[in-house]
Protein backbone atom coordinates (compact mmCIF):
# COMPACT_ATOMS: atom_id res chain seq x y z
CA UNK A 1 0.00 0.00 0.00
CA UNK A 2 1.15 3.54 -0.74
CA UNK A 3 1.69 6.52 1.55
CA UNK A 4 0.18 7.31 4.03
CA UNK A 5 -0.39 3.60 4.80
CA UNK A 6 3.32 2.90 4.39
CA UNK A 7 6.05 5.40 5.42
CA UNK A 8 7.88 7.44 2.82
CA UNK A 9 11.02 7.44 4.95
CA UNK A 10 12.04 5.31 7.91
CA UNK A 11 13.98 7.46 10.36
CA UNK A 12 16.71 5.89 12.46
CA UNK A 13 17.98 6.95 15.86
CA UNK A 14 20.91 9.40 15.81
CA UNK A 15 20.71 9.84 12.05
CA UNK A 16 20.23 12.98 9.99
CA UNK A 17 18.17 11.93 6.96
CA UNK A 18 17.61 14.21 4.00
CA UNK A 19 14.18 15.86 4.13
CA UNK A 20 13.12 16.38 0.53
CA UNK A 21 10.40 18.55 -0.96
CA UNK A 22 8.62 15.32 -1.94
CA UNK A 23 8.51 14.25 1.69
CA UNK A 24 7.20 17.62 2.95
CA UNK A 25 4.60 17.93 0.19
CA UNK A 26 3.41 14.39 0.90
CA UNK A 27 2.92 15.29 4.55
CA UNK A 28 0.75 18.25 3.56
CA UNK A 29 -1.24 16.15 1.11
CA UNK A 30 -1.87 13.53 3.78
CA UNK A 31 -3.10 16.18 6.22
CA UNK A 32 -5.46 17.52 3.53
CA UNK A 33 -6.76 14.03 2.80
CA UNK A 34 -7.52 13.47 6.49
CA UNK A 35 -8.96 16.93 7.17
CA UNK A 36 -11.28 17.32 4.18
CA UNK A 37 -13.75 14.49 4.92
CA UNK A 38 -13.86 15.45 8.61
CA UNK A 39 -14.54 19.11 7.85
CA UNK A 40 -17.24 18.29 5.30
CA UNK A 41 -19.18 16.09 7.68
CA UNK A 42 -21.79 17.31 10.14
CA UNK A 43 -20.71 17.01 13.77
CA UNK A 44 -22.63 14.79 16.13
CA UNK A 45 -25.18 17.03 17.82
CA UNK A 46 -28.13 17.01 20.22
CA UNK A 47 -30.53 19.97 20.46
CA UNK A 48 -33.73 20.48 22.40
CA UNK A 49 -36.23 23.14 23.41
CA UNK A 50 -38.92 22.33 25.95
CA UNK A 51 -39.92 25.72 27.38
CA UNK A 52 -40.63 27.78 24.26
CA UNK A 53 -37.84 30.31 24.83
CA UNK A 54 -34.49 28.54 25.19
CA UNK A 55 -32.72 26.21 22.78
CA UNK A 56 -30.11 23.92 24.34
CA UNK A 57 -27.33 22.93 21.93
CA UNK A 58 -24.84 20.14 22.61
CA UNK A 59 -22.46 19.77 19.66
CA UNK A 60 -19.39 17.55 19.47
CA UNK A 61 -15.99 19.14 18.90
CA UNK A 62 -15.69 20.53 15.39
CA UNK A 63 -13.59 22.67 13.06
CA UNK A 64 -14.80 25.99 11.70
CA UNK A 65 -13.29 28.74 9.54
CA UNK A 66 -12.65 31.69 11.84
CA UNK A 67 -14.64 34.77 10.82
CA UNK A 68 -11.84 37.16 11.83
CA UNK A 69 -8.61 35.37 10.85
CA UNK A 70 -9.81 33.12 8.04
CA UNK A 71 -7.95 30.21 9.63
CA UNK A 72 -9.51 26.85 10.42
CA UNK A 73 -9.85 26.53 14.19
CA UNK A 74 -10.88 23.79 16.58
CA UNK A 75 -13.89 24.38 18.84
CA UNK A 76 -14.17 22.20 21.92
CA UNK A 77 -17.49 20.52 22.65
CA UNK A 78 -19.57 22.36 25.23
CA UNK A 79 -23.26 22.84 25.94
CA UNK A 80 -24.75 26.19 24.94
CA UNK A 81 -28.09 27.83 25.78
CA UNK A 82 -29.47 30.04 23.01
CA UNK A 83 -32.04 32.76 23.70
CA UNK A 84 -33.17 35.67 21.52
CA UNK A 85 -36.27 37.61 20.50
CA UNK A 86 -37.84 34.81 18.50
CA UNK A 87 -40.07 35.88 15.56
CA UNK A 88 -43.67 34.87 14.91
CA UNK A 89 -44.48 32.04 12.48
CA UNK A 90 -41.01 31.71 11.01
CA UNK A 91 -37.96 29.46 10.78
CA UNK A 92 -34.67 30.41 12.38
CA UNK A 93 -31.33 28.72 11.82
CA UNK A 94 -28.51 28.36 14.34
CA UNK A 95 -24.85 28.61 13.31
CA UNK A 96 -21.62 28.22 15.25
CA UNK A 97 -19.26 31.16 14.69
CA UNK A 98 -15.63 31.59 15.76
CA UNK A 99 -14.27 35.13 16.11
CA UNK A 100 -10.53 35.09 16.82
CA UNK A 101 -11.01 31.71 18.47
CA UNK A 102 -14.00 32.72 20.61
CA UNK A 103 -17.07 30.63 19.80
CA UNK A 104 -20.67 31.86 19.76
CA UNK A 105 -24.02 30.86 18.26
CA UNK A 106 -25.67 33.05 15.63
CA UNK A 107 -29.44 33.01 15.06
CA UNK A 108 -30.29 33.82 11.45
CA UNK A 109 -33.21 33.90 9.04
CA UNK A 110 -30.88 32.70 6.26
CA UNK A 111 -31.20 28.98 5.58
CA UNK A 112 -28.16 26.73 5.22
CA UNK A 113 -26.71 25.84 1.87
CA UNK A 114 -27.83 22.34 0.97
CA UNK A 115 -24.91 19.98 0.52
CA UNK A 116 -24.92 16.54 -1.03
CA UNK A 117 -24.79 14.82 2.36
CA UNK A 118 -26.69 17.48 4.26
CA UNK A 119 -26.37 21.16 5.20
CA UNK A 120 -22.98 22.28 6.53
CA UNK A 121 -22.75 26.07 6.30
CA UNK A 122 -24.87 29.19 6.07
CA UNK A 123 -25.72 30.04 2.48
CA UNK A 124 -22.85 32.13 1.11
CA UNK A 125 -20.78 32.09 4.32
CA UNK A 126 -18.44 29.24 5.22
CA UNK A 127 -17.56 30.89 8.56
CA UNK A 128 -21.04 30.00 9.84
CA UNK A 129 -21.17 26.31 10.69
CA UNK A 130 -24.74 25.00 10.62
CA UNK A 131 -26.15 23.53 13.83
CA UNK A 132 -29.94 23.22 13.56
CA UNK A 133 -33.28 24.68 12.50
CA UNK A 134 -35.83 26.17 14.91
CA UNK A 135 -39.53 26.76 14.22
CA UNK A 136 -41.36 29.62 15.94
CA UNK A 137 -45.14 29.69 16.45
CA UNK A 138 -47.54 32.65 15.92
CA UNK A 139 -46.83 33.84 19.48
CA UNK A 140 -43.08 34.08 18.97
CA UNK A 141 -42.34 30.93 20.95
CA UNK A 142 -40.06 28.09 19.92
CA UNK A 143 -42.09 25.04 18.91
CA UNK A 144 -40.98 22.35 21.36
CA UNK A 145 -38.70 19.70 19.85
CA UNK A 146 -35.59 17.64 20.19
CA UNK A 147 -33.06 16.74 17.53
CA UNK A 148 -30.31 14.16 17.31
CA UNK A 149 -27.90 14.34 14.37
CA UNK A 150 -30.35 16.01 11.99
CA UNK A 151 -33.40 13.95 12.99
CA UNK A 152 -36.10 16.16 14.52
CA UNK A 153 -38.96 15.03 16.75
CA UNK A 154 -41.78 17.39 17.67
CA UNK A 155 -43.06 17.33 21.23
CA UNK A 156 -46.57 18.57 20.39
CA UNK A 157 -49.58 17.72 18.23
CA UNK A 158 -48.64 19.60 15.05
CA UNK A 159 -51.35 19.23 12.40
CA UNK A 160 -50.94 20.14 8.74
CA UNK A 161 -54.25 18.68 7.51
CA UNK A 162 -57.48 18.84 9.53
CA UNK A 163 -60.77 17.18 8.60
CA UNK A 164 -59.98 17.29 4.89
CA UNK A 165 -62.24 15.33 2.55
CA UNK A 166 -60.65 13.60 -0.42
CA UNK A 167 -61.34 14.63 -4.00
CA UNK A 168 -60.11 11.54 -5.84
CA UNK A 169 -57.12 13.37 -7.31
CA UNK A 170 -53.62 14.29 -6.16
CA UNK A 171 -53.26 17.53 -4.24
CA UNK A 172 -50.41 19.33 -2.50
CA UNK A 173 -49.91 18.84 1.22
CA UNK A 174 -47.92 21.81 2.49
CA UNK A 175 -45.97 21.03 5.66
CA UNK A 176 -43.98 24.29 5.80
CA UNK A 177 -45.26 25.11 9.28
CA UNK A 178 -43.43 22.13 10.77
CA UNK A 179 -41.01 20.93 8.08
CA UNK A 180 -38.03 23.03 6.98
CA UNK A 181 -37.51 23.78 3.26
CA UNK A 182 -34.35 21.64 3.11
CA UNK A 183 -35.97 18.50 4.58
CA UNK A 184 -35.14 15.13 3.03
CA UNK A 185 -37.56 12.90 4.95
CA UNK A 186 -40.69 13.44 7.03
CA UNK A 187 -42.55 11.34 9.60
CA UNK A 188 -46.34 11.66 9.60
CA UNK A 189 -49.33 10.23 11.42
CA UNK A 190 -52.54 10.05 9.37
CA UNK A 191 -55.99 9.72 10.94
CA UNK A 192 -58.29 8.10 8.40
CA UNK A 193 -62.08 8.10 8.56
CA UNK A 194 -63.36 5.74 5.88
CA UNK A 195 -67.04 6.22 5.04
CA UNK A 196 -67.20 3.64 2.25
CA UNK A 197 -68.41 0.06 2.41
CA UNK A 198 -64.99 -1.34 1.58
CA UNK A 199 -61.40 -0.98 2.76
CA UNK A 200 -59.96 2.38 1.70
CA UNK A 201 -57.96 5.35 2.82
CA UNK A 202 -55.38 7.86 1.67
CA UNK A 203 -52.21 7.73 -0.42
CA UNK A 204 -49.11 9.91 -0.16
CA UNK A 205 -46.31 10.44 -2.64
CA UNK A 206 -43.22 12.55 -3.33
CA UNK A 207 -41.56 13.59 -6.60
CA UNK A 208 -44.94 13.13 -8.40
CA UNK A 209 -44.39 9.40 -8.67
CA UNK A 210 -45.50 6.21 -6.94
CA UNK A 211 -47.67 6.36 -3.85
CA UNK A 212 -47.90 4.83 -0.38
CA UNK A 213 -51.41 3.72 0.59
CA UNK A 214 -52.70 3.88 4.18
CA UNK A 215 -56.07 2.16 4.72
CA UNK A 216 -58.85 1.80 7.26
CA UNK A 217 -61.55 -0.87 7.36
CA UNK A 218 -64.95 -0.26 5.78
CA UNK A 219 -67.07 2.31 7.65
CA UNK A 220 -64.35 2.69 10.24
CA UNK A 221 -61.41 4.86 11.24
CA UNK A 222 -57.76 4.22 12.04
CA UNK A 223 -54.39 5.88 12.55
CA UNK A 224 -51.32 5.06 10.49
CA UNK A 225 -47.70 6.19 10.75
CA UNK A 226 -45.69 6.99 7.64
CA UNK A 227 -42.09 7.99 6.94
CA UNK A 228 -41.60 9.26 3.41
CA UNK A 229 -38.74 10.81 1.43
CA UNK A 230 -39.19 14.39 0.28
CA UNK A 231 -37.26 17.15 -1.45
CA UNK A 232 -38.64 19.97 0.67
CA UNK A 233 -41.59 20.98 2.80
CA UNK A 234 -44.44 19.53 0.72
CA UNK A 235 -45.67 16.20 -0.63
CA UNK A 236 -48.90 15.09 -2.34
CA UNK A 237 -51.97 13.25 -1.04
CA UNK A 238 -54.94 11.56 -2.65
CA UNK A 239 -58.14 10.14 -1.14
CA UNK A 240 -61.67 9.41 -2.39
CA UNK A 241 -64.61 11.62 -1.44
CA UNK A 242 -65.69 8.99 1.11
CA UNK A 243 -62.51 9.53 3.15
CA UNK A 244 -61.75 12.27 5.66
CA UNK A 245 -58.09 12.77 6.61
CA UNK A 246 -56.16 14.46 9.41
CA UNK A 247 -52.36 14.57 9.20
CA UNK A 248 -49.86 15.34 11.95
CA UNK A 249 -46.15 15.92 11.49
CA UNK A 250 -44.26 13.82 14.04
CA UNK A 251 -40.80 14.81 12.86
CA UNK A 252 -38.46 15.35 9.93
CA UNK A 253 -34.87 14.80 8.83
CA UNK A 254 -32.38 16.98 7.01
What does each model-identified segment do?
Residues 39-43, 61-65, 87-98, 146-213, ...:
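Beta-rich globular "head" domains
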Residues 81-84, 161-163, 224-225, 236-237:
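Beta-strand-rich interaction surfaces with strong enrichment in secreted/lumenal proteins
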Residues 126-141, 186, 226-243:
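Noncatalytic modules at the cell exterior or secretory-pathway interfaces
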Residues 25-56, 111-169:
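Glycine-rich, low-complexity segments
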Residues 208-248, 253:
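Contiguous ligand/interfacial binding patches
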Residues 95-111, 135-138, 188-197, 238-242:
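Short, flexible beta-strand-to-coil junctions
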Residues 1-37:
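Extracellular "spike/adhesin" assembly and maturation modules
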Residues 29-113, 149, 198:
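Glycine-rich, compositionally biased intrinsically disordered regions
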Amino acid sequence: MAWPFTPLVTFLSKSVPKVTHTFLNSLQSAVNAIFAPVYHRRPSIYVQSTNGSQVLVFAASLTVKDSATGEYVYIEQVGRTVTTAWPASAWRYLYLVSTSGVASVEVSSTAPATGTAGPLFKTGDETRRYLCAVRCDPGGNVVKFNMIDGRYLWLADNQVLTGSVGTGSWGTLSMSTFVAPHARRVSLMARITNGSGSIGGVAFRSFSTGGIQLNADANSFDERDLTIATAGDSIEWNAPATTTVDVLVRGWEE
